[in-house]
Amino acid sequence: MKVAIIGATGYGGIELIRLLEQHPYFSIASLHSFSQVGECITNVYPHFQNVLVHTLQEIDAEEIVKEAEIVFLATPAGVSAELTPKLLAVGLKVIDLSGDFRMKDPFIYEQWYKRAAAKEEILSKAVYGLSEWKRSEVQNANLIANPGCFATAALLATLPLVRSGIIEEDSIIIDAKSGVSGAGKTPTTMTHFPELYDNLRIYKVNEHQHVPEIEQMLAEWNRETKPITFSTHLIPISRGIMVTLYAKVKREMEIEQLQKLYEETYEQSAFVRIRTQGEFPSPKEVRGSNYCDMGIAYDERTGRVTVVSVIDNMMKGAAGQAIQNANIIAGLEETTGLQHMPLYL
């Protein structure tokens, strides 16, 4: 099956290229850019030399559909909302890595993203692509809203507790830390090497755009869920996310019960790995892979459960999950082309 990538020169775009070039079923028909049309991709990123030869093209839905069936949008928020109606109109399936189609309520999107929302008729067609929890919906979708990186790690950790109804609905606290690639390719003062090296920064306190995305998905599984407390930090690594979830249980529990809950929830999910009791993952252990690793603890003194969830923000948090969703759409095994062993060193 032929695919196209729009926004091919951003970090999400080049990760898609890397994965798709190794995929046994998908092949890249075309690469598209806004600012570097006419350039060979190897001139922009020399690490692709002798691997692929593609000239970056203009974005024309009528031309793209002549060769491709699926389009990956690795474009910023706002851009995807503008492009997607044209792509859907010519019969293309769209997997969008931005946040433009994640929120069902356009008012909430505008409140958190500070920009105009996509048209409601397009929003209504979008399926939120958290693969492990939305398989049946993804399978028949024409438009996938690929989840955010923080939201992916947070939701995979939180949903088993929320669905089971064993935690106090107003007790969810999520502390998240991310590598700098999650901030995108465009440099800022905060991501500048002298500012970030040997340092740690909290940002978007109480206003991160993944908050409503997480709350919306939690509410699908438990309408009693209340607003969450969510904080994000930038740490001096290139890629990787660690989310630590805290929540208070409604009744006394044993750690074995919680361990069993997670193991049973994800026993059919190839990319979610639950650590044995008392062990906890680190981002390095999933780097370069599509895995989400989790460890669970329970504090009998406070009645709080702690879940540690780690992913590679460029893989399970972006390009890897996008291809996982494309596999589902194409009727392939979810793991096709994604069985990469983590790059530990």
From Swiss-Prot:
<keyword id="KW-0055">Arginine biosynthesis</keyword>
<dbReference type="GO" id="GO:0006526">
    <property type="term" value="P:L-arginine biosynthetic process"/>
</dbReference>
<dbReference type="GO" id="GO:0003942">
    <property type="term" value="F:N-acetyl-gamma-glutamyl-phosphate reductase activity"/>
</dbReference>
<comment type="function">
    <text>Catalyzes the NADPH-dependent reduction of N-acetyl-5-glutamyl phosphate to yield N-acetyl-L-glutamate 5-semialdehyde.</text>
</comment>
<keyword id="KW-0521">NADP</keyword>
<dbReference type="GO" id="GO:0005737">
    <property type="term" value="C:cytoplasm"/>
</dbReference>
<dbReference type="GO" id="GO:0051287">
    <property type="term" value="F:NAD binding"/>
</dbReference>
<feature type="active site">
    <location>
        <position position="149"/>
    </location>
</feature>
<protein>
    <recommendedName>
        <fullName>N-acetyl-gamma-glutamyl-phosphate reductase</fullName>
        <ecNumber>1.2.1.38</ecNumber>
    </recommendedName>
</protein>
<dbReference type="Pfam" id="PF22698">
    <property type="entry name" value="Semialdhyde_dhC_1"/>
</dbReference>
<dbReference type="InterPro" id="IPR000706">
    <property type="entry name" value="AGPR_type-1"/>
</dbReference>
<dbReference type="InterPro" id="IPR000534">
    <property type="entry name" value="Semialdehyde_DH_NAD-bd"/>
</dbReference>
<dbReference type="InterPro" id="IPR036291">
    <property type="entry name" value="NAD(P)-bd_dom_sf"/>
</dbReference>
<dbReference type="Pfam" id="PF01118">
    <property type="entry name" value="Semialdhyde_dh"/>
</dbReference>
<dbReference type="GO" id="GO:0070401">
    <property type="term" value="F:NADP+ binding"/>
</dbReference>
<comment type="pathway">
    <text>Amino-acid biosynthesis; L-arginine biosynthesis; N(2)-acetyl-L-ornithine from L-glutamate: step 3/4.</text>
</comment>
<keyword id="KW-0560">Oxidoreductase</keyword>
<dbReference type="InterPro" id="IPR050085">
    <property type="entry name" value="NAGSA_dehydrogenase"/>
</dbReference>
<keyword id="KW-0028">Amino-acid biosynthesis</keyword>
<comment type="similarity">
    <text>Belongs to the NAGSA dehydrogenase family. Type 1 subfamily.</text>
</comment>
<keyword id="KW-0963">Cytoplasm</keyword>
